[in-house]
Each structure stands twice: as structure tokens, then as C-alpha cells.
């Protein structure tokens, strides 16, 4: 009987804590830089880019890679599935630092342009897919 009561009390406590968590609001973390690279050169590009990234942009960026053993890697930086920068990285790291610095500058410029476009082209009477 004691064991039965213990199980009932434990079950009630579990249900009570479950109800407490149901009322909580999920917190979204802004400004994530997501790594979707596969090869070592892609990972190094992501590390170099993220180490130097100092933007106040609150959206999420994704760095994607399409590797090729023969030719190198095609790196794409996207925001909400919109491509804002693409480059080709060679496996021998030719001009690697220049490419990272150029990617940072172009990404920052593209994000600024995107923000200006969204501000100027705000069409509150149309849905996003209608414009």
C-alpha cells in the first residue's frame, strides 16, 4: 500500500511540473551563425568568419558548403533561404584570408542593403508571397 501511494504522489508531482513548463514561453536566440559545412576547408572558413564576425545583425546566418574533391568547395552564406554571398574556396587555401575578409565585408553590405530594402518596400497590404 505504501508503495502504491508513493507511485501516485510521484505521478502527481510529474504532472504538476509538466503543467508548469506548459505555460512557459519559448525564448528565441537572435543572431545565430550556423555551420553547415562538411570539409576541413569549409570548417576553417566558418571558424575564421565567425571569429571576425562583429555585426549587430539580429537575424540568423547560415554558412553552407558544396564540396568537390577535385575543384574545392562552393561556400554560400544565406539569410532566411536568401543567398547573400557565394564564393569558391580552393583546397590549397589560395588567398584564404582575403576571401574571409571579402566575405565579411560583402555580407555586412548585403545585410544593410536588405534591411534598407525591407524598410523602403514595406507593403503592409500585401502578403509576403504576393510581392
UniProtKB/Swiss-Prot annotation:
Keyword Lyase (UniProt): no
Listed Pfam families: CsgE
InterPro entries for the chain: Curli_CsgE
Signal peptide: 1-22
Keyword set, alphabetical order: Signal
NCBIfam families for this protein: PRK10386.1
Record's function text: May be involved in the biogenesis of curli organelles.
Name of this protein: Curli production assembly/transport component CsgE
Amino acid at each position: 500500500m505504501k508503495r502504491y501511494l508513493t507511485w501516485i504522489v510521484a505521478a502527481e508531482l510529474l504532472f504538476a511540473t509538466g503543467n508548469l513548463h506548459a505555460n512557459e514561453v519559448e525564448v528565441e536566440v537572435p543572431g545565430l551563425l550556423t555551420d553547415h559545412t562538411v570539409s576541413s576547408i569549409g570548417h576553417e572558413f566558418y571558424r575564421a568568419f565567425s571569429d571576425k564576425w562583429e555585426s549587430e545583425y539580429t537575424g540568423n546566418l547560415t554558412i553552407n558548403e558544396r564540396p568537390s574533391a577535385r575543384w574545392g568547395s562552393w561556400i554560400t552564406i544565406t539569410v532566411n533561404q536568401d543567398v547573400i554571398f557565394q564564393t569558391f574556396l580552393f583546397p590549397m587555401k589560395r588567398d584564404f584570408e582575403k576571401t574571409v575578409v571579402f566575405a565579411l565585408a560583402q555580407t555586412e553590405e548585403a545585410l544593410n542593403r536588405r534591411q534598407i530594402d525591407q524598410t523602403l518596400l514595406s507593403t503592409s497590404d500585401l502578403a509576403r508571397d504576393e510581392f
